[in-house]
Curated annotation (Swiss-Prot):
Active-site residues, record numbering mapped to chain: 117
Keyword Coiled coil: no
Name of the protein in its database record: Nucleoside diphosphate kinase
Annotated Pfam families: NDK
EC number(s) per entry: 2.7.4.6
HAMAP family given in the database record: NDP_kinase (MF_00451)
Enzyme class: transferase
GO terms for cellular component: cytoplasm
Amino acid sequence: MSAERTLILVKPDGVSRGLVGEVVGRIERKGLKIVALELRTLERSVAETHYGEHASKPFFGELVEFITSGPLVALVAEGPRAVEALRGLIGATDPVKAAPGSLRGDFALEIGQNLIHGSDSPESAKREIDLFFPGLS
């Protein structure tokens, strides 16, 4: 099976709580390889592009404010069915509905600060990787 790539963001709440190592460790223990990793504070324009599909929703402004509020870690993981594997590892968007053992189930408390973002499809992964790591995909 060919390797697939996916983008993961450890959001500002995860960075400030010191959970980057936990996230990276779980990704690696899952059998995926990290091929790019960067600590950065997002510019508003990048955040607005990244979350563009939510632009008309009432929570868009709050989402952009949060994701640009402090440093985050952007990383690209690679392996067979990487998108699907990471979605399972991350857990449901709402931490209350996330399974125990998932990152959100274990470490997140509220939907607005849910620790981590993962691409939801191979197509989204390509678009997101191109935005965060131009030239990598």
